[in-house]
């Protein structure tokens, strides 16, 4: 996470915002109006406890080309995640995040067991061999979420009517944006968010990394 100042502003000034839809499209933009990818938008009901059902099969975060793919993954609490290594070299995946600490020593192919993510929060991933490899898993206690694509849009569907907490997170933002919205009916609605990101402080990839590392 960057220490640089990050400012998140909703273009709407009304709190709570009334959204006449059961589907919410969250459009994340930078101050110049350009789309922001890899933002996680979630809606948490405020009038009832959301029912969270983790998927039966593990979610995969792949190591390929000495990178984690995807860079940002959003899951619900209770999801198991596997970290297949498709590279010829070995990787050592780990996290020291409060929401999940784990360590997968040097391996190729499939690790023995998936990792269970049983607490909400943001989990930062790294590789002990390749310093530039980084990724994030956002663990949520709500089933209503989406990750923005290259167009900056995150579309959240199946939302029950009522008051919700909208939260938008990005790895280069100092903190997540939160606000209240009211989902009032059917159809679709759009929330536009202006997001200023801090400096990207990821370690640069080693120029001679291809084919290197531990065999």
Language-model segment annotations:
Residues 6-16:
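Bacterial N-terminal signal peptides
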Residues 1-2:
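N-terminal secretory signal peptides that target proteins for export/translocation
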